[in-house]
């Protein structure tokens, strides 16, 4: 099986550079289509307020939409700076695309990631919280696809030495088959 599609869940901060570099390095090596989408955290409406005050739900939604725009801008700017062309219907070589209408919540990675060969995410760092961990777990356990966690600084080469951690679960069997 050859890798032809890469999914990159995007957040709107500079720590994403390493994930983008890693995805591009793999994309160039395998001549892949790289797709990004804004990883947006969901908030339940019953959790919006507390005894000391609250966060207006509309303000939260506006902030979430603004973060999604920033994530898209980071992704598209990076791809354009590295001369990666946007995908067309006939493109069969290295190209990129953006999913505008991604659902909120970390579980989207698990369901949407099933149609991709690999999911590239940044490793946990100071910007990460428990939601980021759940997003990684969703991608790994629900998509059944391999997750490539990018190191804090981008690698110079990729796929020369590979370590696979496997706990013998059925969820990971398909990821290992790659």
Q: What are the roles of these predicted feature ranges?
A:
Residues 35-37, 97-101, 148:
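General small-molecule cofactor/ligand-binding pocket signal
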Residues 12, 95-100, 125-128:
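Short, flexible loop segments at the rims of nucleotide/cofactor-binding pockets, characterized by
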Residues 20-28, 106-155:
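Gly/Ser-rich helix-loop-strand patches that form or flank binding pockets
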Residues 1, 41-43, 80-119:
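Structural beta-alpha unit
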Residues 1-58, 142-145, 156-178:
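Small/aliphatic-rich secondary-structure junction motif
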Residues 14, 62, 66, 103-107, ...:
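Residues at secondary-structure transition points
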Residues 56-70:
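A short acidic, glycine-rich active-site loop
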Residues 71-82:
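Ordered, amphipathic secondary-structure segments that act as subunit-interaction surfaces
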């Amino acid at each position: 099986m050859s890798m032809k599609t890469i999914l990159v869940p995007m957040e709107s901060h500079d720590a994403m550079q390493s994930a983008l570099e890693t995805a591009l390095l793999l994309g160039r090596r395998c001549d892949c289509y790289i797709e990004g989408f804004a990883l947006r955290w969901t908030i339940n409406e019953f959790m919006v307020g507390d005894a000391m005050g609250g966060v207006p739900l509309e303000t939260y939604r506006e902030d979430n939409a603004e973060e999604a725009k920033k994530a898209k801008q980071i992704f598209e700017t990076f791809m354009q700076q590295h001369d990666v062309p946007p995908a067309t219907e006939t493109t069969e070589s290295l190209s990129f695309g953006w999913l505008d209408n991604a659902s909120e919540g970390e579980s989207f990675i698990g369901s949407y990631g099933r149609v991709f060969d690999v999911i590239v995410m940044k490793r946990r760092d100071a910007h990460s919280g428990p939601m980021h961990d759940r997003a990684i777990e969703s991608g790994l356990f629900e998509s059944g696809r391999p997750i490539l966690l990018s190191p804090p600084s981008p690698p110079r080469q990729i796929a020369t030495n590979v370590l696979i951690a496997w706990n013998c679960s059925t969820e990971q069997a398909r990821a290992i088959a790659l």
